[in-house]
């Protein structure tokens, strides 16, 4: 199946929210961020049926509109166990930054979540993807491998990786996650759509991203 990808970037932290669309106009929302109206307008314009919400990790700029779309479309939310833990933690989900520095309402969520396990394949309607859990930037960081495209959240970006100096970040976990990712995907290539910045590919990052070239010895901080 060929999936289509729509990216919507907000202006606060330049966070990318995504719509993954199948050939029947069903859609998954990935990391609904600070501009729910723009996302909703895109969904309406394209005539999409939302069938689920995926969370790569529970930092505020990736979960701000989860409750809004969960209530609007009456669909399940999918996240790792550790990401679920952070939904209601204003410090480790970084809501305190949004409220103290940008005047944003804090995002404190107590919602049912479908739990994702590492290296496990899931199906939502026609969507089939494998979840991979790679802590470091956040304890519950999850990538979504759709076979023909991948969403990495704030784990891996074009040319770099997610910050590891936030509350709940862990440099040693990040190093281990980079090693694991490199081993799992050393012979696989597909487009990567990250939580910030432009799209890239797995092999481009494995060959040029300094943090993936030699994860054992790279200086993270």
Pin down the residues of each PLM region:
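Short Gly/Pro-enriched turn/cap motifs at secondary-structure boundaries
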Residues: 8-10, 111-114, 133-135
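Metallo-beta-lactamase
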Residues: 93-96, 128-220
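Short acidic-hydrophobic surface loop/beta-edge motif
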Residues: 8, 20, 118-125
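Active-site HxH/HxHxD metal-binding segment of metal-dependent hydrolases
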Residues: 35-121, 210-217
């Amino acid at each position: 199946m060929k999936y289509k990808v729509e990216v919507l970037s907000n202006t606060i932290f330049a966070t990318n929210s995504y719509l993954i669309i199948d050939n029947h106009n069903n859609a998954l929302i990935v990391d609904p961020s600070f501009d729910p109206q723009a996302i909703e307008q895109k969904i309406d314009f394209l005539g999409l049926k939302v069938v689920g919400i995926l969370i790569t990790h529970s930092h505020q700029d990736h979960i701000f509109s989860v409750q809004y779309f969960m209530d609007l479309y009456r669909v399940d939310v999918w996240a790792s166990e550790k990401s679920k833990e952070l939904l209601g933690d204003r410090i480790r989900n970084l809501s305190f930054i949004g409220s103290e520095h940008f005047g944003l309402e804090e995002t404190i969520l107590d919602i049912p979540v479908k739990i994702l396990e590492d290296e496990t394949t899931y199906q939502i309607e026609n969507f089939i993807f494998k979840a991979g859990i790679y802590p470091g930037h956040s304890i519950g960081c999850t990538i979504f491998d759709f076979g023909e495209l991948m969403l990495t959240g704030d784990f891996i970006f074009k040319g770099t990786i997610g910050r590891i100096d936030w509350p709940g970040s862990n440099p040693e976990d990040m190093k281990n996650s980079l090693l694991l990712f490199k081993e799992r995907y050393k012979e696989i290539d597909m487009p990567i759509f990250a939580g910030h910045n432009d799209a890239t590919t797995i092999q481009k990052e494995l060959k040029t991203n300094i943090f993936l070239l030699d994860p054992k010895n790279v200086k993270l901080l």
